Swiss-Prot record:
BP term (GO), one: translation
Listed name of the protein: Small ribosomal subunit protein bS20
A GO CC term assigned to this protein in UniProt: cytosol
Gene responsible for this protein: rpsT
Example of a GO MF term: structural constituent of ribosome
Length: 98
C-alpha cells in the first residue's frame, strides 16, 4: 500500500480513470454490437427502415469511438481500426457485391 500522500492520490486517480475507461469501452462495444446486429437484420430483411437503423447505429458507434479516442481511453490507431471494421461490415451489407 502507498505510504505517502502523492502515492495515495495516484492510486485514487488510477481507480477513477479505470472506471471511466471501463464505461467508455463497454458502451463502445455495445454500440458496435448493435451496429453488427443491425447489419445482420438488414441482410436478412432489406428495407428502408432497416437501412436507416444500420446508418443510425453506425453513426452512434463512430461518435462513441471518437469520444473515447479524444478522452484518451483508446489509442487513435485502435479507434481507426474499430471504425474501419464497422465501415467494412456496413459497406458489405449496403453495397451489393458486383
Amino acid at each position: 500500500m502507498a505510504n505517502n500522500k502523492s502515492a495515495k492520490k495516484r492510486i485514487e486517480i488510477a481507480e477513477r480513470n479505470r472506471l471511466r475507461n471501463r464505461t467508455y469501452k463497454s458502451s463502445m462495444r455495445t454500440l458496435m454490437k448493435r451496429c453488427f446486429a443491425a447489419c445482420d437484420a438488414y441482410s436478412a430483411t432489406p428495407g428502408d427502415e432497416a437501412k436507416a437503423s444500420v446508418q443510425t447505429s453506425m453513426r452512434a458507434a463512430f461518435s462513441k469511438i471518437d469520444k473515447a479516442v479524444k478522452v484518451g481511453v483508446l489509442h487513435r490507431n485502435n479507434g481507426a481500426n474499430q471504425k474501419s471494421r464497422l465501415s467494412a461490415a456496413v459497406r458489405k451489407v449496403l453495397e451489393p457485391a458486383s
